Swiss-Prot record:
The keyword DNA-binding applies. Residues 32-56, 69-78 have a biased composition (Pro residues). Residues 196-220 are annotated as: Hinge. Belongs to the nuclear hormone receptor family. NR2 subfamily. Keywords: Cytoplasm, DNA-binding, Metal-binding, Nucleus, Receptor, Transcription, Transcription regulation, Zinc, Zinc-finger. This is Retinoic acid receptor RXR-beta. Homodimer (in vitro). Heterodimer with other retinoic acid receptor family members. Binds DNA preferentially as a RAR/RXR heterodimer. Interacts with NR1H3. Interacts with AKAP13. Residues 1-129 are annotated as: Modulating. It comes from the Eukaryota. PROSITE patterns: NR_LBD, NUCLEAR_REC_DBD_1, NUCLEAR_REC_DBD_2. Residues 221-454 form the NR LBD domain. GO terms for cellular component: cytoplasm; nucleus; RNA polymerase II transcription regulator complex.
Amino acid sequence: GEAGRDGMGDTGRDSRSPDSSSPNPLSQGIPPSSPPGPPHTPSAPPPPMPPPPLGSPFPVISSSMGSPGLPPPAPPGFSGPVSSPQINSTVSLPGGGSGPPEDVKPPVLGVRGLHCPPPPGGPGAGKRLCAICGDRSSGKHYGVYSCEGCKGFFKRTIRKDLTYSCRDNKDCTVDKRQRNRCQYCRYQKCLATGMKREAVQEERQRGKDKDGDGDGAGGAPEEMPVDRILEAELAVEQKSDQGVEGPGATGGGGSSPNDPVTNICQAADKQLFTLVEWAKRIPHFSSLPLDDQVILLRAGWNELLIASFSHRSIDVRDGILLATGLHVHRNSAHSAGVGAIFDRVLTELVSKMRDMRMDKTELGCLRAIILFNPDAKGLSNPGEVEILREKVYASLETYCKQKYPEQQGRFAKLLLRLPALRSIGLKCLEHLFFFKLIGDTPIDTFLMEMLEAPHQLA
């Protein structure tokens, strides 16, 4: 189950933003991702964009998820406020109008403004490290001091009687950064450090004796209830529909004078706000540190949006249905020069979702797996995020067995969509960076901020 998603979601790691001095005039109003200096006053105002700019989606996180108390300190060398008329404009939620002034917090200052506080006590506080990967240990598990991630990996391997193989020479590095790369070597290191298989089996027996109390597998669905994940999908779907008056024109023509790329970019920009609302409804996401919430959304936004519009397009033939209500036909995509990636979306995602009749609960669980990405760069506690991802895995597997008992391979088939989402997500980022560089496609404020500061901590 884990193999399909390891290392996913760290999408900007391979795709750096183009130099912020690119000719695109829209980028002048966005904090650059280069080292911050004195505030930059653009010599010419940016040209008007089709929809009015709404500001950064991330003040919504800091306002509606609770302020961390004190504002993060300014990054080194930064003096003065960010003078950006676009980002500092009033945030208005879709379908909800503008909130009161106190609900709007200053935007996140690029990625260099993200402040991840060090763990209490610092590195020299006498904390034990995980014997397998070197991360912070959460205690002794199965006879060895280990982190929650390696504990969960070992437990799942034993309980499901999983077997692994190594693609290299069975001597892969297993550390905090690369522990998900090779499951075979990670498991061998668990055994080499002294983790006991029988301890897992005894724990399972104790869990059965207590009718699923404790940390037995039976508790996982309650910890990550799929009905709440479905509620999150349905809630943001309704919010998206409020801005749609009816099906738009096919191929981006008729009522929409824009080309397909512009339509897709504008739809993605609007959906970034909805994405924040969705994430807040996923169990346990709001309990993560505020900075980690921002990092996870930055790391997964493109895959999360692609998964949504792919599933929304199941009933559309040879095209996709945007959240704005517009249909984009593959012929239009080909004429706009994005036919190859468009066809990959149709064949690797939309048609596969259609063939297996993926339901919205399963879609929500896949998106939650993408969201809880322990490999996102800069997380203050990746182990905690990994535990949440494990809980989604367990809940999704239980749901598949109960809802589709006759389809034994359904859970695995769902997870096989995750590598395709990651690959397509990276390719879409490349296209967006190119459109931004040449500057002939209107890219709105939220989307531009994502491209200016692509989830990389300095």
